[in-house]
Swiss-Prot record:
Full protein name: Cytochrome c biogenesis protein CcsA
Single GO MF descriptor: heme binding
Subcellular location(s) of the protein: Plastid, Chloroplast thylakoid membrane
Assembly notes: May interact with Ccs1.
InterPro entries attached to this UniProt entry: Cyt_c_assembly, Cyt_c_biogenesis_CcsA, Cyt_c_biogenesis_CcsA/CcmC
TM helices/strands, residue ranges: 13-33, 46-66, 73-93, 101-121, 146-166, 234-254, 263-283, 295-315
Gene Ontology annotations for the cellular component aspect, listed alphabetically: chloroplast thylakoid membrane; plasma membrane
Top-level taxonomic group: Eukaryota
Keyword Thylakoid among record annotations: yes
A Pfam family recorded for this sequence: Cytochrom_C_asm
Primary location group: plastid
Underlying gene: ccsA
Keywords, comma-separated and alphabetical: Chloroplast, Cytochrome c-type biogenesis, Membrane, Plastid, Thylakoid, Transmembrane, Transmembrane helix
PANTHER family attached to this UniProt entry: CYTOCHROME B_B6 PROTEIN-RELATED, HEME EXPORTER PROTEIN C
Amino acid sequence: MIFSILEHILTHISFSVVSIVMTIYFLTLLVNLDESIGFYYSSDKGIIITFFSITGFLFTRWIFSGHFPLSNLYESLIFLSWAFSIIHMISFFNKKRKKNLNAITAPSAIFIQGFATSGLLNKMPQSAILVPALQSQWLMMHVSMMVLGYGALLCGSLLSIALLVITFRKVGPFFYKKNINRKKFLTEFFSFDVLYYINERNSILLKQNINLSFSRNYYRYQLIEQLDYWSYRIISLGFLFLTIGILSGAVWANETWGSYWNWDPKETWAFITWTIFAIYLHIKTKQNGRGINSAIVASIGFLVIWICYFGVNLLGIGLHSYGSFTSN
């Protein structure tokens, strides 16, 4: 009973803090930077609170259930939100303070955690005894690596999508336009113009004491370079996690089912995901720099990851059907 109450408290704290962080984050884009910079840094620190809340939740559930909390969709979503908070903190503690990355990780964390705590998963939060197939020391290694890989690949893919949007977008950021109606504001607010604005505003702040003028194209190019820089490195990290997860899963499958690979839906889509991002890394290696082709491949990979992550859970078939919607 105590563990259950503590889980609910920690979950609500983390979700509430992330919601407040998102509110503060977007409000700071609508007011003067000098007046809002303190609130912006406070919102970044809120992610740290979220990280420790989710960490406490995972440890509490681990102690209560007696196994690592990655046995169903609810727990894996919370762990995925935890992974996004780690990526967010990497940019927070980075000396250059890459706010472009924060614009991706914070909304992703609140969306995933909001879905995990929604009524759609109301039957999953309760801990249960593991099915025999999951009672293995490989559970922590395999599932944690896969979820961390999903988190990093999703984040890197979103940055690549932002790169494509900003590259092909001809209209300047809406923050500089006056007399914007409410409908248009809401439509463009959730486009990647927010990343454009953050970069240009910060660049102007850094140069405000120097009598130099930079064209908007320079800031646009600088932003594209930053997005490409971070997407490549985050996707590379996610690809490493995914590779380790697939290999450890193959060893686990051989111990449990007597075969390293069975081509069930989850394994098939995991292989497709791995192949797509292997192509991405190959293109990046050949390009030796920024490229649209690699960003397109990463954007396709974004959709494939969600199919791989939720496909089996929606269908409830195959060897990985445990923890799915239908099995609960």
